[in-house]
């Protein structure tokens, strides 16, 4: 009993500690220059305390639900504040706290000259808190609060530099695309309420309903919006308009993995529904390939890393599609470390080169930024799934499982091509930023010796090397069964990755001396992001607006307000007057009509007398 009390109290302490700096915003501490330090220290302590229940959970394997506040009862449905402390939430919480701790420390260096740095830290912390609410929620209502929370905080953080039009547009774009996904979430919530009369996860999972396609489609739409899957993906690269720490937090342990996490949570409903699994698998495969193609020709360092995030999210969705939610979750956890580190390395480069983001204007940075360079190389190799780095433990397993799943060879092929392309664009980043001759302004002073920068990246560097090994041993199944697959299947992931490296290196060396008169159609397709923004953001609104203008001017003004009423009345009057007053020269007829009128008048007078 004491163990259970310690478990529950330590996790509640972790979550309550995070709210302390938010509460302090009404005091003088919020105006203090040391406020960012308070926030960072709070998160570091929260991480250390969260390791207690996580360690206990790993050793005991005992799931727990804390239900400690009954909010309201609507007819037969009870709404309570309840936390689900299972395998997924207990491992995710320390990972998210560890990554955010490093990002907060990095932000103290990156945003030191910002006049509103205290507000920035408060927003980052609220972003983390809403993600924690989402992860630990045991009912759909609480999950929805966390879901909307990360949405609104992403809007505030992406549009942080609201003096720039691009930042405002990107923030609005993120909200609008997520709004489409939220429609699916609300639809699923409404369906569960009408048909199952509950929002509690346990009751939803044990209830047997014949057809769950409708709510699962809604949840898939929600995940598509939040995790930037194909169709609702353009907001993710645009979100790079926010400061680099925002990009790091947005793409590692919060927001974008929320959609994948939602599908993992509702996996018990999906595991026997083959239609939904096939849909999820195909959606993930298309996303991972399409975004990998887009990443190949981008020149903005942050955009390339953003597209790589979208590609990895597609891989996670593929994993859910082949019925492996635990592997998808493992990839979420491992991906958080190296992706946050890649963004922080790019932030270090951007900051040192006076806000230069174009990789064509970098080069030779391995001499002047040795630590950042080392971290960037390790992060890129971990992303490609290089053996025994963090990414390998999840990515290799995913490719192996897909190879032996005997379903949908088309989706598997797309995933393998995308894996190869991951190596290609990672090589491109390393080739253009770190190698060759310096192509930046020689007058720039470069300095990476700040302890805030070094320590934050160092922690994630260690995570990118060792975290995969540690997490993969504490994820189910804990004992791996004997694998019976031929060597060529076992080595597929490594082979396609090495192929991507070799091809990319060859192409990078060739492209330096290659001069094309006109860019090829494939290049245009990739650099213009598959014509998606052009069609969705330019062509379709233009067609709509021009059609509306024509309808308003032609139908309303020209026809109804002009032709139908004023012109038609005047035309009718003119026609009738012309018809009536037309002189034909029939004098006898005129006299006759005059006499008839006169006789009628006289008769009326006589009869009156």
Swiss-Prot record:
GO terms for biological process: ATP synthesis coupled electron transport; electron transport coupled proton transport. The chain crosses the membrane at residues 3-23, 46-66, 90-110, 115-135, 140-160, 174-194, 216-236, 244-264, 276-296, 304-323, 328-350, 368-388, 410-432, 460-480, 485-505, 585-605. The keyword Translocase applies. Its EC number is 7.1.1.2. Keywords: Electron transport, Membrane, Mitochondrion, Mitochondrion inner membrane, NAD, Respiratory chain, Translocase, Transmembrane, Transmembrane helix, Transport, Ubiquinone. InterPro entries: NADH_DH_su5_C (IPR010934), NADHpl_OxRdtase_5_subgr (IPR018393), ND/Mrp_TM (IPR001750), NU5C-like (IPR003945), Proton_antipo_N (IPR001516). GO terms for molecular function: NADH dehydrogenase (ubiquinone) activity. This is NADH-ubiquinone oxidoreductase chain 5. It comes from Phoca vitulina. The lineage of its organism: Eukaryota, Metazoa, Chordata, Craniata, Vertebrata. The gene is MT-ND5.
């Amino acid at each position: 009993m004491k163990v259970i009390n310690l478990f529950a109290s330590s996790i509640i302490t972790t979550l309550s500690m995070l709210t302390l700096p938010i509460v302090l915003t009404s005091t003088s501490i919020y105006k203090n220059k040391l406020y960012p330090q308070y926030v960072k220290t709070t998160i570091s302590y929260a991480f250390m305390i969260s390791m207690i229940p996580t360690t206990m959970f790993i050793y005991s394997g005992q799931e727990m639900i804390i239900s400690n506040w009954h909010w309201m009862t609507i007819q037969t449905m009870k709404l309570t504040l309840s936390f689900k402390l299972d395998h997924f939430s207990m491992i995710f919480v320390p990972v998210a706290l560890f990554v955010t701790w490093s990002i907060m420390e990095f932000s103290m260096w990156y945003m030191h000259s910002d006049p509103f740095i205290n507000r920035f830290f408060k927003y980052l912390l609220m972003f983390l808190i809403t993600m924690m609410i989402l992860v630990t929620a045991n009912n759909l209502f609480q999950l929805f609060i966390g879901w909307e929370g990360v949405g609104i905080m992403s809007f505030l953080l992406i549009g942080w530099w609201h003096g720039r039009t691009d930042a405002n547009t990107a923030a609005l774009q993120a909200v609008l695309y997520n709004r489409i996904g939220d429609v699916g979430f609300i639809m699923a919530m409404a369906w569960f309420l009408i048909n199952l009369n509950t929002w509690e996860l346990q009751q939803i999972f044990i209830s047997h309903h014949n057809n769950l396609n409708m709510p699962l489609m809604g949840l898939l739409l929600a995940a598509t919006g939040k995790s930037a899957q194909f169709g609702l993906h353009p907001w993710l690269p645009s979100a790079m308009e926010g400061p680099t720490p925002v990009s790091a937090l947005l793409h590692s342990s919060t927001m974008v993995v929320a959609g994948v996490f939602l599908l993992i949570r509702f996996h018990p409903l999906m595991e026997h529904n083959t239609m939904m699994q096939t849909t999820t698998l195909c959606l993930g495969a298309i996303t991972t390939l399409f975004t990998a193609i887009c990443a190949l020709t981008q020149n903005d360092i942050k955009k390339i890393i953003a597209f790589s995030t979208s590609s990895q999210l597609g891989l996670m969705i593929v994993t859910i599609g082949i019925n492996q939610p635990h592997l998808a979750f493992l990839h979420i956890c491992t991906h958080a470390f190296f992706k946050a580190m890649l963004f922080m390395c790019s932030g270090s480069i951007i900051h040192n080169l006076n806000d230069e983001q174009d990789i064509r204007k970098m080069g030779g940075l391995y001499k002047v930024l040795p630590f950042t360079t080392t971290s960037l190389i390790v992060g890129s190799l971990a992303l490609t799934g290089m053996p025994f780095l963090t990414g390998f433990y999840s990515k290799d397993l995913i490719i192996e499982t897909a190879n032996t799943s005997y379903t949908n060879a088309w989706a598997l092929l797309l995933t393998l091509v995308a894996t190869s392309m991951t190596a290609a664009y990672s090589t491109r980043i390393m080739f253009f930023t770190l190698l060759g001759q310096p192509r930046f302004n020689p007058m720039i002073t470069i300095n990476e010796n700040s302890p805030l920068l070094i320590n934050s990246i160092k922690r994630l560097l260690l995570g990118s090397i060792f975290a995969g090994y540690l997490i993969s041993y504490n994820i189910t199944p804990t004992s791996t069964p004997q694998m019976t697959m031929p060597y060529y299947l076992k080595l597929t992931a490594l082979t396609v990755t090495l192929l991507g490296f070799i091809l990319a290196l060859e192409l990078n060396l060739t492209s330096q001396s290659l001069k094309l008169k006109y860019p090829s159609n494939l290049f245009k397709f990739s650099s213009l992001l598959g014509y998606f923004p052009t069609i969705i953001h330019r062509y379709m609104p233009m067609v709509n607006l021009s059609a509306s203008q024509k309808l308003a001017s032609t139908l309303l003004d020209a026809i109804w307000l002009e032709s139908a009423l004023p012109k038609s009345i005047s035309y009718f009057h003119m026609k009738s007057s012309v018809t009536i007053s037309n002189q034909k020269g029939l004098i006898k007829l005129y006299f006759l009509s005059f006499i008839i009128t006169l006789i009628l008048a006289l008769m009326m007078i006589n009869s009156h007398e």
